[in-house]
Swiss-Prot record:
Tissue and organ expression note: Expressed by the venom gland.
UniProtKB keywords: Antibiotic, Antimicrobial, Disulfide bond, Secreted, Signal, Toxin
Name of this chain's protein: U14-lycotoxin-Ls1b
Domain WAP: 21-66
Described function: Has antibacterial activity.
Cellular compartments annotated: Secreted
Cellular component GO terms, alphabetical: extracellular region
Biological process terms in GO annotation: defense response to bacterium
GO molecular function: toxin activity
This protein's record includes keyword Membrane: no
Amino acid sequence: MNSKVFVVLLLLALSTCVLSEKYCPTPRNTSCKKMNIRNNCCRDSDCTSNAFCCAEPCGNFCHKASDKPGGRRVDPNASCKTGYVYW
């Protein structure tokens, strides 16, 4: 009986961890003119209020976490500078 209770509690704990995963929201814009690309952040630590630094077509921007996957967090190891990006 104890092993059944343990398994149920373990599954409950694991599902809570999986459901609490946070993501970058889906970007609003799907395209961007090159002259409008700017990075407001290069890593999560550049953002305030526990926001994520998310990659979007017009650059990197801080966003509140979303429960649904759809966006992409910026790779903190990638070469990045804040400000306008000139190609």
